[in-house]
Amino acid sequence: MIHQLLAEFMGTALMIIFGVGVHCSEVLKGTKYRGSGHIFAITTWGFGITIALFIFGNVCINPAMVLAQCILGNLSWSLFIPYSVAEVLGGVVGAVIVWIMYADHFAASADEISPITIRNLFSTAPAVRNLPRNFFVEFFDTFIFISGILAISEVKTPGIVPIGVGLLVWAIGMGLGGPTGFAMNLARDMGPRIAHAILPIKNKADSDWQYGIIVPGIAPFVGAACAALFMHGFFGIG
């Protein structure tokens, strides 16, 4: 149990180090890859998740996936809260590590980059704030994401799951990520959002808890539950 919780914690932290790190690299003043664009960022998210899965193996690194596995009977319901907490804490620690790595660039950017942009390096935000529509986007993105992972996991070729999940993240990010930034994962959003709230970042905005709780906080669980029920009912996966 402890070993698996640590794997969830470290796997999520590594995912966030890649993901939040690429946003900092792309946005902050003085980095070598500033202005590289969304393809650069989305590709790094996909590859970063692939590497995390290769290193830590059979991990969820996403409370929405934990919920899906509990619904399908692959995990005990008693593990839902411990796994989810470990993943969120991993998200916090991963974001703190990125902040330490980019501390000089945060300092250089304090008077140039808006507080909202700084917040958005850590957590997701909608392009157009419309909470019902934002909720639907995150619900649907997560439904596709969890359904895709469950389908990929049925293929028993060694190494296919990490690669397939990375490609799935890339496709969702490119095709469906524009409205909300495709969190699909409470730990991906809430962990870095907590880090943003507690870190001594100069001239920072509030952490927008309303959006964080309603959209990336709740919608991924609804999408994951529907995905688990759909994949079990339609394809017999479970």
UniProtKB/Swiss-Prot annotation:
Main location (coarse class): membrane
* GO terms, molecular function: glycerol channel activity
Span of the annotated motif NPA 2: 185-187
Q: Which UniProt keywords apply?
A: Cell membrane, Membrane, Transmembrane, Transmembrane helix, Transport
Positions of short motif NPA 1: 62-64
Q: Which locations, inside or outside the cell, does it occupy?
A: Cell membrane
What results from gene inactivation?
Cells lacking this gene show a decreased lactate transport ability.
Please give an example of a GO cellular component term from this record.
Answer: plasma membrane
What is the membrane topology listed in the Swiss-Prot or TrEMBL record?
A: Multi-pass membrane protein
Give the transmembrane ranges.
2-22, 39-59, 80-100, 135-155, 158-178, 211-231
State the similarity comment.
Answer: Belongs to the MIP/aquaporin (TC 1.A.8) family.
What the protein does comes down to: Transporter that facilitates the transmembrane diffusion of water, dihydroxyacetone, glycerol, urea, H(2)O(2) and D/L-lactic acid. Is involved in the cellular racemization of lactate and lactate metabolism, but has likely a more general physiological role. The transported molecule is indeed lactic acid and not the lactate anion, in agreement with the assumption that, with very few exceptions, MIPs (major intrinsic proteins) only facilitate the transport of uncharged solutes.
UniProt name for this protein: Glycerol uptake facilitator protein 4
Native species of this protein? Lactiplantibacillus plantarum (strain ATCC BAA-793 / NCIMB 8826 / WCFS1)
